[in-house]
Amino acid sequence: MARSIKKGPFVDDYLVKKVEKAKASKDNKPIKTWSRRSTILPDMIGLTFNVHNGRAFVPVYITENHVGYKLGEFAPTRTFKGHKGSVQKKIGK
């Protein structure tokens, strides 16, 4: 179920302050965050966020297409190694 329109998008307060500070100072340093649950707002376009995926920080550059999504959607937490195949398939026989 989607979030109610009357509530508005969720963004952590500290993250909004960091975005405003970065926009005011024209700073190109990435903003480090653990807040994967925050929604990407139009104010964030052009900024780079380092989003934590549980192990490392993944750089995410925000464009217009990202608006409305969550930060965590662009920092995958699981690595897919592929399905196990037989040895003959790998050799090519």
From Swiss-Prot:
Stated family: Belongs to the universal ribosomal protein uS19 family.
Protein name as catalogued: Small ribosomal subunit protein uS19
GO CC, one annotated term: small ribosomal subunit
Biological process annotations from GO: ribosomal small subunit assembly; translation
GO molecular function: rRNA binding; structural constituent of ribosome
Role this protein plays: Protein S19 forms a complex with S13 that binds strongly to the 16S ribosomal RNA.
Keywords attached to this entry: Ribonucleoprotein, Ribosomal protein, RNA-binding, rRNA-binding
Keyword Ribosomal protein among record annotations: yes
Gene3D superfamilies (alphabetical): 30s Ribosomal Protein S19, Chain A
